[in-house]
A protein has these predicted regions:
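ATP/NTP phosphate-donor binding region
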Residues: 1-90
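Active-site segments that bind and position negatively charged phosphate/pyrophosphate groups
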Residues: 192-228
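Short, conserved catalytic/metal-binding motifs centered on acidic residues
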Residues: 17, 97, 176
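A glycine/threonine-rich phosphate-anchoring loop and its flanking beta-alpha core
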Residues: 12, 108-205
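A short, small-residue-rich loop immediately preceding and capping a beta-strand
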Residues: 83-120
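Short glycine/serine/threonine-rich phosphate/pyrophosphate-binding segments
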Residues: 21, 44-48, 98-105, 123-127
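Predominant activation on well-ordered alpha-helical scaffold segments within soluble catalytic domains
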Residues: 25, 52, 77-80, 173-184, ...
Length: 228
C-alpha cells in the first residue's frame, strides 16, 4: 500500500482588489486569446460595460453567451456547444456560483481553460475544482470533480460590496465555517477533497481567514449597509 501523501490545490492565479474588473483583459491574455464570456443578463447589465472595455483595451475579442440560470447537465452541454462554435480557448464565468459551476463543467468537457470573475461573496465555486449540477427543476443531481482548478480567479471587491448585503453575510458565514472544517480534518488526519491529507498551508489559510473575518467582518458588513 502506498504511503499517504499531503496535497493542496488552488487556482493558477488569484487577483483581488477594488476596480480589478478593469484589468480582467490584462490577466486573461496569458490564459487565452479567444475568451467566451458567460453571464446572465442581470450581471451583464451591472458589469458588462467594464468587462467589454477591459478586454478591448487588452486586444482581446468580446464574445458573450447568456447563462440561463440553472447549472444543469442540459445547460452545461449547451455551453459546450457555444464554446466549440465560437472557437474559444478559455471560458470566463462572470456572476455567482451557478454561473461559475456551469462554466467550469463546460470548460472541462470542451477541453479548454476556464477563469472566474465572481460578483458575490456567497459561494465557494470560484476557486474550487468541482461543480454542483442540478436538475432542470433546481434539485441537486451530482457533483462533478475536475483534475485542476480555474486558471484565473479575479475578484473586484467593489463589485462584491455592491451586491445585496445578505450575500456578503452568507459568504462570511461560509468562510468562518471553513476553519472549523479544516481544523477537524487536520485533527483527524483525514483525506481532503484535494485527494490527500491536509497540508500546513491549507490549514493555515483557513485559520487566517477565520482571524481576518473575526476582526473585520462586522465592520465590513456595517460599512456595506451604510452605503445602501
Amino acid at each position: 500500500m502506498a504511503a499517504p501523501v499531503r496535497t493542496v490545490i488552488s487556482p493558477g492565479r488569484y487577483v483581488q482588489g477594488k476596480g480589478s474588473i478593469h484589468q480582467l483583459g490584462e490577466y486573461l491574455k496569458p490564459v487565452g486569446s479567444t475568451p467566451l464570456l458567460v453571464a446572465d443578463d442581470l450581471v451583464w447589465g451591472l458589469v458588462g460595460h467594464d468587462v467589454e472595455a477591459s478586454l478591448k483595451n487588452a486586444g482581446l475579442p468580446v464574445q458573450r453567451e447568456t447563462f440561463r440560470g440553472v447549472p444543469s447537465a442540459k445547460e452545461v452541454d449547451r455551453l459546450v456547444e457555444a464554446i466549440k462554435s465560437s472557437g474559444s480557448d478559455v471560458a470566463v464565468a462572470i456572476g455567482g456560483g451557478s454561473t461559475i459551476d456551469a462554466v467550469k463543467a463546460a470548460g472541462f468537457l470542451a477541453d479548454i481553460r476556464w477563469a472566474n470573475c465572481p460578483t458575490v461573496a456567497s459561494t465557494d465555486a470560484p476557486c474550487s475544482a468541482l461543480s454542483v449540477i442540478y436538475t432542470e427543476d433546481g434539485e441537486f443531481e451530482e457533483y462533478r470533480f475536475f483534475p485542476r482548478n480555474p486558471d484565473l480567479v479575479l475578484v473586484d471587491s467593489q463589485v462584491v460590496a455592491n451586491a445585496p448585503v445578505d450575500l456578503l453575510v452568507a459568504g462570511v458565514g461560509d468562510a468562518l465555517a471553513t476553519w472549523l472544517e479544516a481544523r477537524a480534518t487536520a485533527q483527524s488526519n483525514s483525506n481532503t477533497m484535494a485527494g490527500g491529507l491536509p497540508t500546513l498551508t491549507g490549514t493555515a489559510l483557513a485559520k487566517l481567514s477565520w482571524d481576518v473575518l473575526w476582526d473585520n467582518a462586522l465592520q465590513a458588513v456595517d460599512a456595506v449597509r451604510d452605503t445602501r
